[in-house]
A protein has these predicted regions:
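Non-heme Fe(II)-dependent double-stranded beta-helix
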Residues: 1-14, 19-116
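Catalytic core of non-heme Fe(II) oxygenases with the double-stranded beta-helix
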Residues: 100-152
């Protein structure tokens, strides 16, 4: 089973998958530095579902984020589930800092739109830093994409 086949299987069963090293270390460093600059210039404080620094519309702020839109290892996974109606809704950043605490578990899909048979949206998360006890990590509930619940 190749990477794409395994990722598709994990998405169907668990609702998420992990693709390692989608960008190389130098690109991740450049994206991180650019994101820090964008956060300083354009970021806002968000407390919705937990404290964090939020930066909206990243591709408009810097071309380095364009690769997140159509990366050849990521886009085919989205296309598999969302064709022919694939639309980029947003490309934003949620920067969790030491002391920001946990974000509450939630679905990004409004409850009235939840559909366990056909996905109506998918998110990609681009981790530019390693997880650590200070900043934590993204929490997921395996299988919750089939639960029909707005907050697993």
């Amino acid at each position: 089973m190749n990477e794409q086949e395994q990722a598709l299987q994990e998405l169907k069963i668990y609702g998420f998958t992990i693709l390692k090293s989608v960008v190389d270390a130098d690109t991740a460093d450049a994206m991180r530095e650019t994101l820090i600059r964008c956060a300083e210039e354009h970021g806002t404080e968000h407390t919705h579902r937990g404290a964090a620094r939020h930066v909206s519309n990243l591709p408009v702020l810097d071309r380095i984020f364009h690769q997140c839109i159509d990366h050849p290892r990521v886009l085919p996974l989205l296309e598999h589930f969302l064709q022919p109606s694939l639309i980029l809704g947003s490309l934003n950043s949620r920067i969790v800092r030491p002391g920001d605490g946990y974000q509450g578990l939630h679905s990004d899909i409004p409850v009235y739109m939840l559909n366990m048979d056909t996905p109506v949206m998918m998110n990609t998360v681009w981790m530019l830093d390693d997880f650590s006890p200070e900043i934590g990590g993204t929490r997921v509930v395996p299988g919750s994409h089939k639960s029909g619940l707005g907050a697993p």
